[in-house]
Amino acid sequence: MNKQTATKNLDEIITKVEGARLRISEHHIVKIIGISKYSTSTDVKTLYEAGQRAFGENKVQDLKQKMEDLDELPLEWHFVGTLQKNKINNLIDLNPTLIQSLDSLDLALELNKKLEAKNKKLSALLQINSAYEETKSGVLPEVAVEVYKQILELCPNIVLKGVMSIGAHVEDEKIIKESFKTTKKIYDELVPFGAKYCSMGMSSDFELAIACGSN
């Protein structure tokens, strides 16, 4: 990927994001996270030069490699994949900006225990399976608020900052929209408990996600 292509692609995405957010409100701010799991470190550097600053990885070892390769750049790294318990210590040592995929109370308790042992804190989002899909991770919508509150109470070394969900994996836009609206409703309930981020939408559906309140 050369800089010209990266700039063109990024500009197209920013234009779409701007259009979607302004249809809600000029005060609705949206942060773009570039998912770099299929990109090389060189690609990430090119995107950085084009203006992108935040990137997401779904494997701990890939995150480690790219963080080491691009150590000189002021990048913001998010972990967005399924976190296996045997990788928790490795992820803690990398100190990502945000773990977007905290998908159960059980995982939160294990993460908190290991954070306490290292005297560290990490920010995270609770992942919600709003599409009720067996292939997706996350807590079910009907227990999400309660699980969020339990993590706040039981896991002082995890700084919860909101929720994340992946839209329904179907062609029907109405069904995808419903899954996003379900997550947004939960997010709204959690704002009084400190939730700041409602992370929804991928390359195929981010405009719809923003229309439903993703930020």
Predicted features and spans:
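Conserved alpha/beta-domain cores
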Residues: 1-204, 212
